[in-house]
Amino acid sequence: FMRSDRIIIGTDNAETESHLRNLYRPFNRNNDRLIAMDIRSAELTKYAANAFLATKISFMNEMSQLAERLNADIEQIRIGVGSDPRIGYHFINPGCGYGGSCFPKDVLALEATAKTVHYTPQLLNAVHKVNDEQKRLLFTKIRQYFNDHLKGKIIALWGLSFKPNTDDMREAPSQVLIESALTAGMKIQAYDPVAMSEANRIYQNRVGFSCHENPEAALINADMLVIVTEWNIFFNPDFNLIKQRLKEPVIFDGRNLYDPSHLKQLGFKYYAIGRGETFNQ
């Protein structure tokens, strides 16, 4: 609120606009971040901005699917694409899908609004379909790796919230993975720096789900490590300890945190997003 990138006022009344400008003046002393427009345009601006960011994410996730099938590395592609000043690096990180209280809701709301005026928004429909598929991707990779022999397998799950620095699990990719795994008879040993209370509330009556006091504890006797949220604590782990505690040195990385070549040298099987099957041969 106090450090907004921009302040958009939707009003059709000049007096109201003046009052709002005065209200926000302490937070906009240079008078360069406040934009006034009609109410309908302001409402649409909010939804359009979130839908556009969601579109960028889904576009890169679709490119990651193509990169994986062509044995290319989406992370190198991301750097190349983001270096174009017309595009930039914001919101082009491939991964296991977006979640939260804004992007999924706003994309669907904008699509529904379009239909009320007899317009079918094909791009918006594709954005959330790509995201839904991306959320299922980690479980698909796990299922393929174990040839559908999943019952009794234990997942060490790092990350529960839909993004770092929040305990919000609304529409989180972790929930899609957890539901699929528990339904298949697997067990989840989870760790998240702040979202475990929320996870325990959601899964308090679910057999097979447990939270652990630190990332290392979640690894004990697990068949694999799965990373869903890119918390800083996960970026530089003790790979030797991971290897010791897992039954098998295999990592499914939904956020592309690690260098595939380095993990291969350490003896891991590493399955990330859009990084090409050649890394595991």
PLM regions: where:
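Structural/interface elements that position substrates and couple domains in central-metabolism enzymes
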Residues: 1-281
